[in-house]
Amino acid sequence: HWEIGDQNGHLYLAASGPNEIYSHWFKNLKPGDTFTSVPVAVSLTDQGFDDAVGTMTKYRRIIRRPNADNESLKIIFNDYMNCLWGHPTAAEEFPLIDAAAEAGCEYFCIDAGWYADGDWWDAVGDWRESKKRFPNGVREITDYIRSKGMIPGVWLELEVMGINCHMAQEVPDDWFFMRHGKRVYDRSRYQLDYRNLEVRAYADSVIDRLIKEYGVGYIKMDYNIEPGIGTDLHADSAGDGMLSHERAYLKWLEAVFKRYPDLVIENCSSGGLRMDYAMLSRYSIQSTSDQDDYRYYCTIAANSPSALTPEQSAIWSYPLREGDREEVVFNMVNAMLLRIHQSGHLAELTQERRDLVKEALDIYKTIRKDIKNSVPIWPIGLSQFHDEWTCLGLQSENKIYLAVWRRNGNK
């Protein structure tokens, strides 16, 4: 819990680790036991907001896991946003792969749905390919992606299991969050408990199989439930179980990166949730939103470096089938100073609009070396969704890059 306020003419900041009031957390320490609270960092300055965030940006880079992804800032194409919407098929992927490669993308990620013939929400957990969607297997698609010079990726949600997944009926209750003797579920899914070594072994087996069978080098790791206050199984309190699970998950993640140091895993949670540096000190890239209107997305893009480093901030750019030249430009500028998550039906755009996408990606490749060393600035302040003008800047030692947007208005 943290709060900032003004009381009796004094500004105060209160920050604490888990507690019973705010986190349903209680832990009984026996003689000789120890407990380490969650870490916190505070940036103080008399030079204004930009300076405070710049200092925090540098700090975030220091505590982050060293990795090649945040040095190279490669461009990702993902087939979800304003494109396949979680219903991929082999026939639809091939033209997208061709168009993404032609535009200059370097990763190609198959998003949700590759593992189910139809509706899949409450049945996830097996992570086996759908032969209906991919008659010759997902490997045919990932091989084609590599033949086009890109690294293949897939979508996963490895912290949950659907209530109708056959595995959920076969494994014991201690695989899942429990409260009051019953499994915790939300939106027809159970929350897996990573304190359980069998759960971590299951998760390892999925990662190992996807890398071995499909040759993936990128995983979009999503999370779309709300598990509530935690689990009281083998814990002094629900919050104690929650924090212990979270720390076990982070240890599991560290072990994955130790086995596969070149693997890129994106942190995603219903768009841009769970954007904290417990996660982002491990993950190299973070989904920021599933906002599907590019005119609103510029506000999210412009403000995102206040919460994470620019090179970790993944921004969707999705030219529309029915759009025009200015719509493409607006879309591409959304992502130009951050991490490009290209999407949209690129193969169906006019040649002029496809050329604009390629031009933007070519320019991005010339400036991304500066993004990883820059700090954000906001010349006209943080953006709000109703603002006519929005601006984000990145400042390096000898350069300033500016992204400027105008939406609506008559100027």
Give a label for each model feature.
Residues 383-411:
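Carbohydrate-binding surface patches
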Residues 130-137, 141, 147, 169-329, ...:
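Active-site neighborhood of glycoside hydrolase catalytic domains
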Residues 339-388:
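Contiguous C-terminal substrate-recognition/catalytic subdomains in enzyme active sites
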Residues 39, 111-112, 154-158, 223, ...:
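Glycine-rich, histidine-containing beta strand-loop boundary motifs that form or position
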Residues 1-59, 65, 376-379, 411:
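N-terminal accessory beta-strand-rich subdomains and adjacent acidic, glycine-rich linkers
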Residues 44, 48-49, 83-86, 100, ...:
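Flexible loop/turn segments at secondary-structure boundaries
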Residues 70-204, 214, 218, 235:
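Aromatic-lined carbohydrate-binding/catalytic grooves of carbohydrate-active enzymes
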Residues 29, 132-135, 402:
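Hydrophobic beta-strand core residues of beta-sandwich domains
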